[in-house]
């Protein structure tokens, strides 16, 4: 809950994005230094955390991605996965399974975003993902982030490129 409050222009961009894509408006928004990509955190009252460097220039497709995580309660799922890992700290299969579930969650969020985007917006979405590929934000416990580690980016970009072509 630390960080600066969202600026009026950022709040307005979030409101317009939620309205455009018929998604719930994110009420709690913080601007934070020292992070590279936006992410959601908090189970009961999720907070959208936006990097200070992106506060005024954040793309609506990035907001769309994070709002889709919010709509589908991905922060709670991510927390439960971390809890499962903590309780099964001795079992490498659980770590592997949780990583697969997190990667699939990101892929599903990408698919949901692509279903709402049209034409050139889909290519731009893939480019945004590439720009965020080297983020370290996604590894924080209890968060969701558009960037989910460089290993998974190649697969996600391939899925974005194939979106709509594969039955």
Task: Briefly describe each language-model feature range.
Residues 1-167:
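Hydrophobic topogenic segments
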